Amino acid sequence: MRLSWILTILSICLSALAAATGAEGKRKLQIGVKKRVDHCPIKSRKGDVLHMHYTGKLEDGTEFDSSLPQNQPFVFSLGTGQVIKGWDQGLLGMCEGEKRKLVIPSELGYGERGAPPKIPGGATLVFEVELLKIERRSEL
């Protein structure tokens, strides 16, 4: 009887551990503000054209891309699928001149396929970004 009770408790503990591990397996986007600005007349929103400087690294610190060496900002329309989901979500509500650090799980980056040869499948991405300019598109 006592052995049966111990096995039941052990089974419950293992089930709880498996459930907790599964919940942690799906990571969330992390957004850290590295530099705030005092004056922010407009914040980025879906449909805006953003001019960004960025440096992208893997979790181990290996740099895979950057706009800085060419001093050529990356320009794209926010929230329209032109960039990875982690950017479309992580750059909302930014001010011109603001800097952020984004830690993007693979589900919001390049997923299990990666972007060979520089980004392996399942990679978490770390971006340091700076919003240089917002072009607000007129609403239709």
From Swiss-Prot:
A GO CC term assigned to this protein in UniProt: endoplasmic reticulum membrane
Homology family: Belongs to the FKBP-type PPIase family. FKBP2 subfamily.
EC code: 5.2.1.8
UniProtKB keywords: Endoplasmic reticulum, Isomerase, Membrane, Rotamase, Signal
Residues spanned by motif Prevents secretion from ER: 137-140
Activity regulation: Inhibited by both FK506 and rapamycin.
Key word Chloroplast present: no
Gene Ontology molecular function terms on file: peptidyl-prolyl cis-trans isomerase activity
Signal peptide coordinates: 1-22
Catalytic reaction equation(s): [protein]-peptidylproline (omega=180) = [protein]-peptidylproline (omega=0)
Gene3D superfamilies: 3.10.50.40
Example GO biological process: chaperone-mediated protein folding
All residue ranges annotated as the PPIase FKBP-type domain in the record: 47-135
Function according to Swiss-Prot or TrEMBL: PPIases accelerate the folding of proteins. It catalyzes the cis-trans isomerization of proline imidic peptide bonds in oligopeptides.
Predominant location category: endoplasmic reticulum
Localization terms from the record: Endoplasmic reticulum membrane
EC category: isomerase
Assembly notes: Interacts with ARFGEF1/BIG1 and the C-terminal of EPB41L2.
Pfam families: FKBP_C
Name of this protein: Peptidyl-prolyl cis-trans isomerase FKBP2
UniProt superkingdom: Eukaryota
Source organism per UniProt: Mus musculus (Mouse)
Transcription keyword on record: no
